[in-house]
Amino acid sequence: MPYGTRYPTLAFHTGGVGESDDGMPPQPFETFCYDSALLQAKIENFNIVPYTSVLPKELFGNILPVDQCTKFFKHGAVLEVIMAGRGATVTDGTQAIATGVGICWGKDKNGELIRGWAVEYVEFFPTWIDDEIAESHAKMWLKKSLQHELDLRSISKHSEFQYFHNYINIIKKFGFCLTALGFLNFENAAPAVIQ
Protein backbone atom coordinates (compact mmCIF):
# COMPACT_ATOMS: atom_id res chain seq x y z
CA MET A 1 0.00 0.00 0.00
CA PRO A 2 1.52 3.35 -1.01
CA TYR A 3 1.84 6.21 1.43
CA GLY A 4 2.54 9.90 0.90
CA THR A 5 5.34 12.14 2.04
CA ARG A 6 6.06 12.48 5.76
CA TYR A 7 5.60 15.66 7.75
CA PRO A 8 6.43 16.37 11.41
CA THR A 9 3.70 16.82 14.02
CA LEU A 10 5.79 17.15 17.21
CA ALA A 11 9.05 19.03 17.68
CA PHE A 12 11.33 20.26 20.43
CA HIS A 13 13.73 23.18 20.70
CA THR A 14 17.21 22.81 22.11
CA GLY A 15 20.68 24.30 22.12
CA GLY A 16 24.21 23.55 23.16
CA VAL A 17 27.79 24.76 23.11
CA GLY A 18 31.16 23.08 23.23
CA GLU A 19 34.80 24.03 23.24
CA SER A 20 38.14 22.27 23.16
CA ASP A 21 41.86 22.80 22.86
CA ASP A 22 42.04 19.76 20.60
CA GLY A 23 40.65 19.06 17.14
CA MET A 24 41.42 17.55 13.76
CA PRO A 25 41.98 19.49 10.52
CA PRO A 26 40.54 20.86 8.34
CA GLN A 27 37.80 22.07 10.72
CA PRO A 28 39.06 21.37 14.24
CA PHE A 29 35.93 22.78 15.87
CA GLU A 30 33.84 20.10 14.14
CA THR A 31 35.41 17.28 16.13
CA PHE A 32 35.26 17.57 19.90
CA CYS A 33 33.42 20.89 20.14
CA TYR A 34 30.49 19.76 18.00
CA ASP A 35 30.10 16.55 20.00
CA SER A 36 30.11 18.54 23.24
CA ALA A 37 27.46 20.91 21.88
CA LEU A 38 25.27 17.95 20.88
CA LEU A 39 25.71 16.50 24.38
CA GLN A 40 24.65 19.75 26.03
CA ALA A 41 21.67 19.93 23.65
CA LYS A 42 20.78 16.34 24.70
CA ILE A 43 20.81 15.06 21.11
CA GLU A 44 24.27 13.43 21.11
CA ASN A 45 22.91 9.90 20.64
CA PHE A 46 21.02 10.63 17.42
CA ASN A 47 22.14 10.51 13.81
CA ILE A 48 21.47 14.12 12.82
CA VAL A 49 19.90 14.91 9.43
CA PRO A 50 19.42 18.62 8.62
CA TYR A 51 16.28 20.02 7.00
CA THR A 52 15.53 23.22 5.22
CA SER A 53 12.99 25.40 6.95
CA VAL A 54 9.36 24.73 6.02
CA LEU A 55 6.93 23.80 8.81
CA PRO A 56 3.51 22.14 8.44
CA LYS A 57 0.62 23.74 10.32
CA GLU A 58 0.32 20.57 12.43
CA LEU A 59 3.41 21.73 14.37
CA PHE A 60 1.69 24.88 15.62
CA GLY A 61 1.51 24.63 19.41
CA ASN A 62 3.50 21.39 19.33
CA ILE A 63 7.06 22.65 19.77
CA LEU A 64 8.23 21.81 23.29
CA PRO A 65 11.39 22.28 25.37
CA VAL A 66 13.81 19.38 24.92
CA ASP A 67 13.46 18.29 28.56
CA GLN A 68 9.82 17.36 27.96
CA CYS A 69 10.83 14.97 25.18
CA THR A 70 14.03 13.18 26.26
CA LYS A 71 12.17 10.16 27.68
CA PHE A 72 11.09 9.37 24.10
CA PHE A 73 14.61 9.49 22.64
CA LYS A 74 15.98 6.32 21.02
CA HIS A 75 19.73 5.76 20.94
CA GLY A 76 20.97 5.52 17.34
CA ALA A 77 17.75 6.84 15.80
CA VAL A 78 17.69 9.41 13.00
CA LEU A 79 16.78 12.90 14.21
CA GLU A 80 15.70 15.34 11.54
CA VAL A 81 16.49 18.91 12.55
CA ILE A 82 16.48 22.53 11.53
CA MET A 83 19.76 23.69 13.02
CA ALA A 84 21.76 26.89 13.26
CA GLY A 85 25.21 25.69 14.22
CA ARG A 86 28.75 26.83 13.54
CA GLY A 87 32.20 26.51 14.94
CA ALA A 88 35.12 28.89 15.12
CA THR A 89 38.80 29.11 15.94
CA VAL A 90 39.97 31.78 18.37
CA THR A 91 43.12 32.40 16.32
CA ASP A 92 40.87 33.57 13.45
CA GLY A 93 39.66 36.42 15.66
CA THR A 94 36.37 34.96 16.88
CA GLN A 95 35.82 35.26 20.63
CA ALA A 96 32.08 34.44 20.72
CA ILE A 97 29.40 32.77 18.61
CA ALA A 98 25.64 33.33 18.79
CA THR A 99 23.05 31.14 17.08
CA GLY A 100 19.29 31.16 16.88
CA VAL A 101 16.20 29.72 15.25
CA GLY A 102 13.05 31.73 14.63
CA ILE A 103 9.57 30.53 13.68
CA CYS A 104 6.72 32.29 11.90
CA TRP A 105 3.22 31.15 11.04
CA GLY A 106 1.15 32.40 8.12
CA LYS A 107 -2.60 32.88 7.74
CA ASP A 108 -5.01 32.99 4.82
CA LYS A 109 -7.49 35.77 3.96
CA ASN A 110 -9.91 34.41 6.58
CA GLY A 111 -7.29 34.53 9.34
CA GLU A 112 -6.85 30.75 9.41
CA LEU A 113 -3.45 29.20 10.05
CA ILE A 114 -2.05 27.74 6.84
CA ARG A 115 1.67 26.95 7.30
CA GLY A 116 4.94 28.00 8.90
CA TRP A 117 8.64 28.57 8.37
CA ALA A 118 11.80 28.54 10.43
CA VAL A 119 14.94 30.59 9.85
CA GLU A 120 18.45 30.23 11.23
CA TYR A 121 20.93 32.79 12.54
CA VAL A 122 24.68 32.55 13.19
CA GLU A 123 26.95 35.44 14.13
CA PHE A 124 30.62 35.61 15.09
CA PHE A 125 31.87 38.27 17.51
CA PRO A 126 35.42 39.62 17.96
CA THR A 127 34.82 40.09 21.71
CA TRP A 128 32.94 38.23 24.42
CA ILE A 129 29.20 38.90 24.67
CA ASP A 130 26.43 38.32 27.20
CA ASP A 131 22.96 36.82 26.89
CA GLU A 132 21.37 40.23 26.33
CA ILE A 133 23.58 40.88 23.30
CA ALA A 134 23.09 37.34 21.96
CA GLU A 135 19.32 37.56 22.33
CA SER A 136 18.97 41.05 20.85
CA HIS A 137 21.13 40.22 17.82
CA ALA A 138 19.33 36.92 17.27
CA LYS A 139 15.89 38.53 17.44
CA MET A 140 16.93 41.41 15.17
CA TRP A 141 18.22 39.16 12.38
CA LEU A 142 15.65 36.40 12.80
CA LYS A 143 12.77 38.91 12.72
CA LYS A 144 14.09 40.30 9.44
CA SER A 145 14.39 36.81 7.93
CA LEU A 146 10.97 35.68 9.17
CA GLN A 147 9.28 38.75 7.73
CA HIS A 148 11.06 38.05 4.44
CA GLU A 149 9.62 34.51 4.38
CA LEU A 150 6.11 35.92 4.72
CA ASP A 151 6.61 38.84 2.31
CA LEU A 152 8.16 36.61 -0.36
CA ARG A 153 4.96 34.54 -0.39
CA SER A 154 2.55 37.48 0.11
CA ILE A 155 1.27 35.84 3.30
CA SER A 156 0.18 37.65 6.48
CA LYS A 157 1.53 36.85 9.93
CA HIS A 158 -0.77 34.54 11.91
CA SER A 159 0.78 34.89 15.38
CA GLU A 160 3.80 36.26 17.20
CA PHE A 161 7.22 35.17 15.99
CA GLN A 162 9.01 32.64 18.21
CA TYR A 163 12.73 32.88 18.94
CA PHE A 164 15.28 30.50 20.44
CA HIS A 165 18.93 31.43 20.86
CA ASN A 166 22.22 30.32 22.36
CA TYR A 167 25.77 31.65 22.63
CA ILE A 168 29.29 30.79 23.71
CA ASN A 169 32.23 32.89 24.82
CA ILE A 170 35.19 30.82 23.68
CA ILE A 171 37.86 30.25 26.33
CA LYS A 172 39.75 27.41 24.63
CA LYS A 173 41.17 27.22 21.08
CA PHE A 174 37.98 26.07 19.37
CA GLY A 175 34.28 26.54 19.99
CA PHE A 176 30.92 25.48 18.60
CA CYS A 177 27.40 26.81 19.22
CA LEU A 178 24.06 25.43 18.05
CA THR A 179 20.34 26.09 18.34
CA ALA A 180 17.96 23.54 16.85
CA LEU A 181 14.46 22.23 16.34
CA GLY A 182 14.23 18.44 16.39
CA PHE A 183 11.30 16.50 14.95
CA LEU A 184 9.97 13.45 16.80
CA ASN A 185 6.51 12.47 15.54
CA PHE A 186 5.34 12.26 11.93
CA GLU A 187 2.28 11.62 9.82
CA ASN A 188 1.94 10.96 6.12
CA ALA A 189 0.21 13.04 3.49
CA ALA A 190 -2.18 11.28 1.15
CA PRO A 191 -0.29 9.34 -1.53
CA ALA A 192 -0.14 10.75 -5.03
CA VAL A 193 -2.53 9.07 -7.45
CA ILE A 194 -1.58 9.58 -11.09
CA GLN A 195 -4.33 8.77 -13.59
Curated annotation (Swiss-Prot):
Known EC number: 4.1.1.19
Pfam families: PvlArgDC
Annotated site (Cleavage (non-hydrolytic)): T52, S53
Chief location bin: cytoplasm
Cofactor: record remark: Binds 1 pyruvoyl group covalently per subunit.
GO cellular component: cytoplasm
Organism superkingdom: Bacteria
PANTHER family the record matches: PYRUVOYL-DEPENDENT ARGININE DECARBOXYLASE
Described purpose of this protein according to its UniProt entry: Part of the AaxABC system, catalyzes the decarboxylation of L-arginine. The arginine uptake by the bacterium in the macrophage may be a virulence factor against the host innate immune response.
Similarity-based family: Belongs to the pyruvoyl-dependent arginine decarboxylase family.
Known partners and oligomeric status: Trimer of an alpha-beta dimer.
Protein name (database record): Pyruvoyl-dependent arginine decarboxylase AaxB
Organism: Chlamydia trachomatis serovar A (strain ATCC VR-571B / DSM 19440 / HAR-13)
